[in-house]
């Protein structure tokens, strides 16, 4: 049975873990979103989130974006490769509605799945 949880072990928690992904990442991006990925030595994917005040001024907007990314990751984790992923928000992300945002995320997850199969 596929587990659809988002436990602590599925998150990037320390600055060292984030730095590892930023060093030599695979990138999939749109004008509003970048998802960086790097292979990990675990058997499951992990997710880290970066949503800066520079791009979304209000906390409730940043929280909405983070909540949508976590939910998308939670539902897609069984298909994703054993990589560490870092979600990076860029300008214009606040203008996307929830359904458009979810479609973009799904497209980026698919791109990372294809990149992982090639390498």
Curated annotation (Swiss-Prot):
- Catalysed reaction, written as an equation: Endonucleolytic cleavage of RNA, removing 5'-extranucleotides from tRNA precursor
- What keyword terms does UniProt attach to this protein? Endonuclease, Hydrolase, Nuclease, RNA-binding, tRNA processing
Q: Which GO terms describe its cellular component?
A: ribonuclease P complex
E.C. code: 3.1.26.5
Q: Which GO terms describe its biological process?
A: tRNA 5'-leader removal
Q: Does the keyword Hydrolase apply?
A: yes
| Superkingdom of the source species | Bacteria
- Extract one GO molecular function annotation from the record: tRNA binding
Q: Which Gene3D superfamilies match?
A: 3.30.230.10
Top EC class, one word? hydrolase
Q: Give the protein's function.
A: RNaseP catalyzes the removal of the 5'-leader sequence from pre-tRNA to produce the mature 5'-terminus. It can also cleave other RNA substrates such as 4.5S RNA. The protein component plays an auxiliary but essential role in vivo by binding to the 5'-leader sequence and broadening the substrate specificity of the ribozyme.
Its quaternary organisation is: Consists of a catalytic RNA component (M1 or rnpB) and a protein subunit.
Protein family per UniProt: Belongs to the RnpA family.
What is the name attached to this protein's record? Ribonuclease P protein component
């Amino acid at each position: 049975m596929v587990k659809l949880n988002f436990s602590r072990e599925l998150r990037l928690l320390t600055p060292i873990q984030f730095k590892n992904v930023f060093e030599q990442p695979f990138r999939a991006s749109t004008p509003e979103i970048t998802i960086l990925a790097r292979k990990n030595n675990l058997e499951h994917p992990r997710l880290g989130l970066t949503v800066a005040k520079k791009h979304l001024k209000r906390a409730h907007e940043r929280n909405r974006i983070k909540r949508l990314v976590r939910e998308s990751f939670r539902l897609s984790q069984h298909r994703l490769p054993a990589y560490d992923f870092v979600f990076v928000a860029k300008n214009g992300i606040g203008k996307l509605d929830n359904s458009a945002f979810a479609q973009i995320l799904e497209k980026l997850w698919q791109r990372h799945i294809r990149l992982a199969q090639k390498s």
